[in-house]
Structure formats: structure tokens, C-alpha cells
């Protein structure tokens, strides 16, 4: 008779979870940050709020963002004026948009990832879908399964309203699934659409205005699996270790609440300080077992919540400016896409590493870290091992 331990051993993969493909997608509508304040105050009928507009212009100028992509066009906003007020009841209109657009954008990214992977989609065993918007039943995971034509018995996991740390969460879950289910191939999708958070300006709630200056739309997809098939599957990064923690004394630092007026965001000014104060502890826990204490010797992927967070982390750890190059590039070209950001940065890093003729996918280095920061304040940590190019 076969023992339970023998069954468990047979169920487990031998090697670490590996990212085998990455795909990204954005809406077609591109918004230039330099002209966005004019557009935003005009479309929300707020041009008379000149002092507030000047504040918003300064926020956009300091954001280090060049452009963002948004599903919400001028035409859509004119057809849905309730979205342009500060707190007008508008949830129905928002929901009608995102329940369609979130899976659609996710499909676009997933198709690219599956194409790079090079295997038939029938080999996908698990699906993890993550989005901050559009809670619905059946969920976006179900809709994507139908849109892609995946097998009906794909094992699905749906994550709603986790926010900006969740790019790390999906990697942690994918790692556990791939390593504990021999032969598993996990499709991971993060799809974020800001139609649920867009609203007009308020003189009294400037933290809402910060979100309007930073957030953009985008979707990213990965294929994750252990024990890659030689000559068929091409590893990009290996996931070695993961952790999640709630930063002490951080309650209320980042909050989001679903209301009749959509999803409202609330930020404390000291979010960059809270993150930078707790980052060293997370790094020690992650890299002490590897005997690494020089954090300039590893590659960096950090959720770009905004430039102030990156600046303070750099200063606290004495990081060289080039450490955050891939992270800042994605912030500049796409804005803050919540959970999808760190996956975009993974893609940016492996592509630039190959283009520059470096020896590994991680900017020529062997070890790296990926951080997600978001509501809670929650910190996700993923230790990555790069792959030779």
C-alpha cells in the first residue's frame, strides 16, 4: 500500500518555481502627463479652481511620469458625467465598464505570454487573476477562462481589491502552486483599470488628487512552472523565497473604500517614510540566509507607488541610482498600475538585460529582490534568482 508521504512526494515538483513567459498590455488611449492637468480640469468642469489646478500641475510635474494609458477617453467621460464629479453616485456606470474591460485587457496580456511560452494553452493547470476593481460573480477569472478558451477544469484563484502590493502576492501564490503540484503551469494575470477610481478634484481631499496624478491602466501576465522542459521552455527568473508582512504602526497609511461614488483612496503623507523604515528588516530576513548584506550587489524591482517612495528607499539603503533604473522607467512610461507594475518591471529588466548583452536576466547579477507595497501597509517580498542569457 502506498503511504501518504509517498503520495505527497510524488505530487511535489523537484525544482523552484520559474517564470517562463511574460506578456503586457495597455489600453490604446495614451495620456501625456505634461498636458493632463489641462485635460483633467476641463473634463471635470473644474477650470475655475485655479489654485487647485496649480497644485495638481505641481503634483504631475514632480511625479516623474511622462505618460500613462487609460481606458477612460474624453468621449467615455462625456457620456458618463457622474464619473467627473467628486463624489457623485456612479458605481453602476463604473462597474459596467470594468467588468468587461478588466478581463479583456487581461486576455491581451495573457495571449502574449502564452505565445512566448510556446506551449498549447491546454497545458495551463491553474489561473490566478488579480484586479483592484470590478467585483463580480462569476469573477474576472471565469470571464478570462472563457475568453481564452481554457479548459473548464482549470483551477482558478480570484483576488479582488488587494491594491498595489498584490503583484508580489500573485508571485507568492504561483510559487506555492507550481512547487507543490508536479507539472503545474500557472497563468498569472494582473489587470488594472482606473475607471473605478477616476473622479473630479476636491479642495479638501488632496490625497484623492495624488491618485489622479499617478494611476494608470495596464495588464501583465506570466506563465509560472517548476522543472522547465529542456529545449522547449525558457526560464526567465526563478522564485526562491517569499514573505508578506504588515508594517508596524501603519494602520490607515493606505486605505481604499468602495462607495456609491466608486473606489476612494486615502493616503497618509508618511507612506514613503513607513516603507523606507521597514525595508531593511525585510531585506535582512530575505538575504541573511544567502549571506548577502550588500544591497547594491542585487537587482531591484520595487512597486513604484510614487517617486518619493523610491527616493527614500534609495537614501535609507545607500542604493546607487542605477539600482532603480527599471523601476523608474516603468513609472515614467506607464504610471502606477497597481498590482501590474512589478510584472511590467520584470519584463523591462529581462528585455534590457538581453539588449545590453548582459550575462543574466537580472542586469547581469545573480540575485534580486521584488517588493510590493500597498494597503495595510502591507509589504510583499520575493527573492529572485536570475537566469543566464
Curated annotation (Swiss-Prot):
Q: Name one Pfam family in it.
A: Chal_sti_synt_C
- The catalytic activity of this protein is classed by the Enzyme Commission as 2.3.1.74
- Tell me the active site: 164
Q: Which reaction does it catalyse?
A: (E)-4-coumaroyl-CoA + 3 malonyl-CoA + 3 H(+) = 2',4,4',6'-tetrahydroxychalcone + 3 CO2 + 4 CoA
The enzyme class is: transferase
Asked whether the UniProt record includes Phosphoprotein among its keywords, one would answer no
- State its role: The primary product of this enzyme is 4,2',4',6'-tetrahydroxychalcone (also termed naringenin-chalcone or chalcone) which can under specific conditions spontaneously isomerize into naringenin.
User: Is Transferase one of the keywords?
Assistant: yes
Give the organism the record lists: Pisum sativum (Garden pea)
Q: Name one GO molecular function term.
A: naringenin-chalcone synthase activity
UniProt family annotation:
Belongs to the thiolase-like superfamily. Chalcone/stilbene synthases family.
- Protein name listed in UniProt: Chalcone synthase 6
Keywords for the protein's UniProt record, in alphabetical order: Acyltransferase, Flavonoid biosynthesis, Transferase
Pathway listed for it? Secondary metabolite biosynthesis; flavonoid biosynthesis
SUPFAM superfamilies on file: Thiolase-like (SSF53901)
Q: Which GO terms describe its biological process?
A: flavonoid biosynthetic process; polyketide biosynthetic process
Amino acid at each position: 500500500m502506498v503511504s501518504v508521504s509517498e503520495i505527497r512526494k510524488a505530487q511535489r515538483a523537484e525544482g523552484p518555481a520559474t517564470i517562463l513567459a511574460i506578456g503586457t498590455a495597455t489600453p490604446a488611449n495614451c495620456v501625456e502627463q505634461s498636458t493632463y492637468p489641462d485635460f483633467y480640469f476641463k473634463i471635470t468642469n473644474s477650470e475655475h479652481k485655479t489654485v487647485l489646478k496649480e497644485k495638481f500641475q505641481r503634483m504631475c510635474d514632480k511625479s516623474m511620469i511622462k505618460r500613462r494609458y487609460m481606458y477612460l477617453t474624453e468621449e467615455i467621460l462625456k457620456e458618463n458625467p457622474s464619473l467627473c464629479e467628486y463624489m457623485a453616485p456612479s458605481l453602476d456606470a463604473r462597474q459596467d465598464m470594468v467588468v468587461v474591460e478588466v478581463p479583456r485587457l487581461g486576455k491581451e496580456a495573457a495571449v502574449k505570454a502564452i505565445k512566448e511560452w510556446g506551449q498549447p494553452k491546454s497545458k495551463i493547470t491553474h489561473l490566478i487573476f488579480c484586479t483592484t476593481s470590478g467585483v463580480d460573480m462569476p469573477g474576472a477569472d471565469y470571464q478570462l477562462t472563457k475568453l481564452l478558451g481554457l479548459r473548464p477544469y482549470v483551477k482558478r484563484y480570484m483576488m479582488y481589491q488587494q491594491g498595489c502590493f498584490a503583484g508580489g502576492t500573485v508571485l507568492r501564490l504561483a510559487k506555492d502552486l507550481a512547487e507543490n503540484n508536479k507539472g503545474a503551469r500557472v497563468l498569472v494575470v494582473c489587470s488594472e483599470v482606473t475607471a473605478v477610481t477616476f473622479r473630479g478634484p476636491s479642495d479638501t481631499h488632496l490625497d484623492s488628487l495624488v491618485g489622479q496624478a499617478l494611476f494608470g491602466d495596464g495588464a501583465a501576465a506570466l506563465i509560472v512552472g517548476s522543472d522547465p522542459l529542456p529545449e522547449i521552455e525558457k526560464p526567465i527568473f526563478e522564485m526562491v523565497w517569499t514573505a508578506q508582512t504588515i508594517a508596524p504602526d501603519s494602520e490607515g497609511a493606505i486605505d481604499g473604500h468602495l462607495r456609491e461614488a466608486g473606489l476612494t483612496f486615502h493616503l497618509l503623507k508618511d507612506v514613503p517614510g513607513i516603507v523606507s523604515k521597514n525595508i531593511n528588516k525585510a531585506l535582512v530576513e530575505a538575504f541573511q540566509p544567502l549571506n548577502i548584506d550588500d544591497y547594491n550587489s542585487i537587482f531591484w524591482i520595487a512597486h513604484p507607488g510614487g517617486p518619493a517612495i523610491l527616493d527614500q528607499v534609495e537614501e535609507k539603503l545607500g542604493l546607487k541610482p542605477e539600482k532603480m533604473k527599471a523601476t523608474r522607467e516603468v513609472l515614467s512610461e506607464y504610471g502606477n498600475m497597481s498590482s501590474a507594475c512589478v510584472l511590467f518591471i520584470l519584463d523591462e529588466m529581462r528585455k534590457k538585460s538581453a539588449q545590453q548583452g548582459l550575462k543574466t536576466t537580472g542586469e547581469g547579477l545573480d540575485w534580486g529582490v521584488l517588493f510590493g507595497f500597498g494597503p495595510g501597509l502591507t509589504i510583499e517580498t520575493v527573492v529572485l534568482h536570475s537566469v543566464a542569457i
